[in-house]
């Protein structure tokens, strides 16, 4: 999802993607999605399953609501990628479940998985709450992610530098209310039982 930066009046806006399976992007550039809007025009990603994509699960710039999604078996390219740009972004990231998989590449090599959140900086403002991370022990028993999981330390010229998004204490008012908000565990169970195309019960 992307607009022409030369046409400010012609930007993607008020888009919701929900109850979808977004997976197995074509190799060798296996991506879940690129979501780029302006700071005033948003995309909501709600109750989706991102599965078996090496990177961009998704990659986000602009205004984004990422709630009650399950991410499984992303690779070494990134799970939720936070812009990596000087463009201002504002995200509401709540109650998602990040589950590490086997991370096998199409050529049989092991990729390994990145941290759930990557490529952040101070230009990316985010409210993070209720997100869980689970390893690959075969049991869904993840731990809740903390702000420290979205911070990176480096040393530049002998000085320690901490890079992080700008953490918000609550979601910005510009984001719409999600009335069917679930916990990460409830979202996982709902997606397993109901996700994807559902005719005629839901999508008729």
What label would you give each PLM region?
Residues 1-56, 63-76, 90-102, 127-134:
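Right-handed parallel beta-helix
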Residues 6-7, 54, 59-61, 88, ...:
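Context-gated lysine
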Residues 51-53, 76-80, 109-116:
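Short, flexible active-site loops
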Residues 57-59, 79-82:
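Short catalytic-loop micro-motif centered on adjacent basic/acidic residues
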Residues 94, 98-204:
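Long, contiguous C-terminal flanking segments immediately downstream of a protein's structured core
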């Amino acid at each position: 999802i992307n607009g022409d930066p030369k046409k400010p009046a012609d930007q993607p806006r008020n888009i919701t993607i929900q109850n979808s399976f977004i997976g197995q992007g074509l190799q060798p550039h296996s991506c879940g999605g690129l979501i780029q809007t302006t700071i005033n025009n948003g995309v909501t990603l709600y109750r989706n399953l991102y599965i078996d994509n090496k990177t961009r699960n998704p990659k986000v710039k602009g205004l984004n609501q990422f709630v009650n999604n399950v991410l499984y078996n992303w690779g070494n390219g990134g799970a939720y990628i936070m812009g990596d740009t000087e463009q201002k972004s504002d995200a509401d990231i709540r109650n998602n479940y990040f589950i590490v998989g086997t991370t096998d590449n199409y050529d049989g090599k092991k990729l390994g998985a990145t941290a759930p959140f990557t490529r952040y900086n101070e230009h990316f403002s985010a409210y993070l709450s209720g997100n869980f991370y689970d390893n690959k022990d075969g049991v869904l028993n993840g731990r809740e992610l903390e702000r420290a999981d979205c911070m990176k330390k480096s040393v530049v010229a002998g000085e320690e530098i901490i890079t992080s998004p700008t953490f918000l204490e609550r979601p910005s008012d510009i984001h719409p209310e999600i009335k069917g908000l679930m916990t990460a565990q409830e979202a996982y169970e709902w997606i397993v039982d109901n996700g994807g195309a559902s005719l005629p019960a839901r999508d008729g």
